[in-house]
């Protein structure tokens, strides 16, 4: 089938496109700009890519799948509708793509990409569709010629309800994307309950208050008592976490922090329930190498480490700051310098007090302009809100010859040459800190 994707450069839609290309479909797609992802699709998956969107791109295709960011006034959407081509949102398309598969779905407010990638490492003969790039297989997709699919299930638009889970793992539940749920908390929590109900096997973090309240048959992880002997170590300068899980013995995994042990433990319990052997699980977990943009070490010098992290919610950032302080101590760095690009005006406003708290313990904080993600601009006094910090307000950052430059009004206002530097955000900060912007 000829399938066209509007917004193919997004991490979620590109995963579906690659998966369907591997399944034998002829794919094409469009986006507003050329990126690493669109280049990969063109070079390695035979996709015809149109930049920017153009109505002619849908000529001759049989199905159009579009991202949540696409509006009805998009020229390709309009042309497809006029031509009577089948139009499916990403959410709606999941039913046709995953309907016949044995899906191992991972949901949750935080940690779902990490847990999904770990589960994919533990079950190496599975397909994988993840909302991030696994460093083990260098992609957000892995193809296996069978029915098993590790799938990162997205709650932001209730699309996880279309994921056909055989196994459902939920890391935690916290109100997010509430604009989609019309700020109706009951609807939000019911979506998670329904997601778990769909599955044959359910694994939960039983210390999450909402998950603990559910009356259904589940495999429960109690992190505070089931995970013991946690130890953080460096292996060739990279962070690893060692821990003991219940009576299953010792495990080691790439990454740093109690949350890493928690995510790994959920993946281990899920794999065990699927019938994987414990010694295979222990060995395969060591193949996990982290995921791009999560505690992602993009520069590793003896006197200066630069980390890129996708964290864009205060809970995520607070947990990662704790891990960064541990890593700082292990590496013997004097200072932790953090750059933050807030993501969405709505999220920044809804969580402002928590954002102010979550950077506690950093030595310097740089705040960049809010990445709008298509939202209308709102005036927020971030300089005033974060005045207690050693603060720099800047327009952008870049990295040249191992030096991170902080830029305001086209002038370099400060430079970071040593110690630990970390950039947080889900916008284009990842390209800035990598020196690719």
Regions inferred by a protein language model and the residue ranges of each:
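Short glycine/serine/threonine-rich phosphate/pyrophosphate-binding segments
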Residues: 12-16, 112-118, 136-138, 262, ...
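Short pre-catalytic strand/loop immediately N-terminal to key active-site residues, enriched for Gly-Thr
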Residues: 251-256, 304-308
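Short glycine-rich anion-binding loops that position phosphate/pyrophosphate groups of nucleotides
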Residues: 69-71, 111, 155-158, 174-176, ...
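ATP-dependent carboxylate-amine ligase
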Residues: 1-36, 42-49, 60, 64, ...
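Beta-strand->loop->alpha-helix junctions that form or flank phosphate-binding loops
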Residues: 50-53, 89-92, 129-131, 206, ...
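A conserved, hydrophobic alpha-helical segment in the catalytic core
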Residues: 162-177, 210-212, 252-290, 420
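Redox-cofactor binding/interface segments in oxidoreductases and associated redox assembly factors
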Residues: 64-67, 151-152, 170, 204, ...
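Phosphate-binding loop of NTP-binding sites
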Residues: 19-25, 57, 72-218, 271-272
